[in-house]
Curated annotation (Swiss-Prot):
Keyword Transcription part of the UniProt annotation: no
Listed name of the protein: Probable ribosomal RNA small subunit methyltransferase A
Source organism, top-level taxon: Archaea
Record-listed S-adenosyl-L-methionine binding positions: 23, 25, 50, 71, 95, 110
GO MF entries: RNA binding; rRNA (adenine-N6,N6-)-dimethyltransferase activity
Lineage of the organism: Archaea, Methanobacteriati, Methanobacteriota, Thermococci, Thermococcales
Length: 273
């Protein structure tokens, strides 16, 4: 794959753009691991974000019924259309974070790392069976962190509320060209059954995790502006915020269930909708 990559770079006089996260996956073992982990069948419709030079896309096309590949760089799209004759791959030009996604049931992607957070939050709002996504290793660790872990964050909470995530494979920098400055990891994301998912108020979660090391009551008071509470209102609501469920817990120790209890309490008090 390295030889094929350099052939494309030379043939099309192509220079990767670091600004849009163009680090191309060139290790076949990693590509096969991603495809096998996703357990793709002919009945599957797969979404890929950032197809690059089509090495992963080509494997997906052999196994899936349909592949949608979203690519921002028009130069890449021109190369893919020239070099491959896929009948079941539809390339969509655009920013994956901003455009509407087609319907799919599986995701397999080596995404640009700078869109990791908005991509993941957008993904979790969709119905799908399984996603296998390449992330920066440190981001992946935050995704799979549990309450109380040093990596536990807003991301950890939101992922844990809606899905089960685990690191499938850690990947060194040599698996990409150009080499990124960070290590990577393949992450498997499987949505929880609908009756087990916990839909959380995103503004509340953001407000809490602005101060993840602080006590819940203090975090809410210090982030009250994010909940639409001004300083004058805070004086009258101070006692309520000090008596929310789990007020004396630190934010990074909260489970999704506990955040939901805080949310329901604040709704009853008329503080949030």
């Amino acid at each position: 794959m390295r030889d094929k990559l350099f052939y494309f770079l030379s043939k099309y006089n192509f220079s990767p753009r670091d600004k849009i996260g163009q680090n191309f996956l060139i290790m076949r073992d990693v590509i096969i691991k991603a495809v096998e982990t996703s357990e793709i069948k002919k009945s599957d419709v797969v979404l890929e974000v950032g197809p690059g030079f089509g090495f992963l896309t080509d494997e997906l096309s052999k196994r899936a019924g349909k592949v949608y590949a979203i690519e921002l760089d028009k130069r890449i799209i021109e190369i893919l259309e020239n070099e491959y004759n896929w009948e079941n791959v539809e390339i969509i030009q655009g920013d994956a974070v901003k455009i509407e996604w087609p319907e799919f049931n599986k995701v397999v992607s080596n995404i640009p790392y700078q869109i990791s957070s908005p991509f993941t939050f957008k993904l979790l709002k969709h119905d799908f069976e399984k996603a296998v996504v390449m992330y920066q290793l440190e981001f992946a660790k935050r995704m799979v962190a549990k309450p109380g872990d040093r990596n536990y964050s807003r991301l950890s909470l939101m992922v844990n509320a809606l899905a089960n995530a685990k690191i499938v494979m850690k990947i060194g920098r040599g698996a990409f060209y150009p080499k990124p400055k960070v290590d990577s990891a393949l992450v498997l994301i499987v949505p929880k059954p609908k009756d087990e998912r916990i839909e959380l108020n995103e503004n509340l979660v953001k407000a809490l995790f602005q101060h993840r090391r602080k006590l819940v009551s203090k975090a809410l008071k210090e982030s009250c502006h994010m909940l639409g509470i001004n300083k004058k209102e805070l004086k009258t609501l101070k006692n309520i915020l000090e008596n929310v469920p789990h007020a004396k817990k630190r934010v990074f120790e909260l489970t999704p269930e506990e955040v939901k209890e805080i949310e329901e309490f604040l709704k009853i008090q008329g503080i949030i909708n």
